[in-house]
Every structure is written in structure tokens, then in C-alpha cells.
Amino acid sequence: GGLMGFGLASHVLGRGADAFRMSLWGVLVGVPAFCAVIGAAPLASPMIFALGVWMIGLGGGLFAHGTLTATMNMAPGDQTGLALGAWGAVQATSAGVAVALGGVLRDGVAVAATPASAYSAVYSIEIVLLLVTAVVMAPLLRRRAAQPLPAGTASSA
């Protein structure tokens, strides 16, 4: 899913799509993806689980490519390397903290409940965080929608 997300984002962004909107699509794919993974356990459905995992990768690829492209587009021409490094550092730090906190929470809940319940708790928090991300991104999308498109872009033709 992740590779497909990166490939799709590359294709769409290469045609002039807005990077912030691409990031939002990643968030919007992630919400039902985590719901599918949570729902797969009580339904005992490996297919729903696999679909959810694939969608998590797809959403992650869309989001990552969108945020990287937005970061690079906002950087001054002589500071794109710095922007890339900062983006990478934020991604790595965020992923590390998320995995650590998710693991601690999963283990803590698993002591009192089933492993499926523990993962459901972690993924439910992820859903809430994705929804918060969508809300936080709204001003970026509104501000960009109000700006005129540069002449010659695919969307201005």
C-alpha cells in the first residue's frame, strides 16, 4: 500500500495537484483503514485486516509524499536540502515516539484485556489523531484555495 501511495501521489502531484490536499487524502484514507483493522478482530476476518493494513500503507504514502512536496515547495531554492533534512528528522522523530508510546499503551492495555482490545485502543487513538490532523490542516487548505494559481500550472489552464 505504501509504495502505491507514493506512486499515486507522484503521478497526481506531477500534474500540478496541491500537496496539502494530497496530504489530506492520506489522512482521509487512514481513518477507514484503521477502522477496518479494528473491525477485523471481532469479525475474525483476515481479508478485512489485510485490506485495512494495505489502506494504512496507501494513506501513509499519500500523506508522506504530500507533506514532503509541500515542505520542498515552501523552501527557498537555496535551502531545499535543509528543508528535506528537517522533514526527515520530524518524520523519524514522530515515528519513533509514536511506536514507543503505542507499544507501551498496547502492552498496558493487554495486561487487563485481550491483544485485540489492546491494538484497538492504540488504533482508536490513531483515528482521533488523524481527525485532529484533518482539522489542523483545514486552514492550510483554505489559505491555499484563496491564493491564485501561478500561470502555466496544470490547474490554471
Regions from the language model: what does each represent?
Residues 40, 119-157:
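Multi-pass alpha-helical transporter architecture, strongest
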Residues 18-21, 104-128:
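A membrane-interface helix-boundary motif in multi-pass transporters
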Residues 46-64:
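Hydrophobic core of transmembrane alpha-helices in multi-pass small-molecule transporters
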Residues 28-44:
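C-terminal ends and interior cores of transmembrane alpha-helices
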Residues 62-76:
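Intracellular juxtamembrane helix-capping segments at the cytosolic ends
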Residues 75-90:
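Loop-to-transmembrane helix entry/capping segments in MFS-fold secondary transporters
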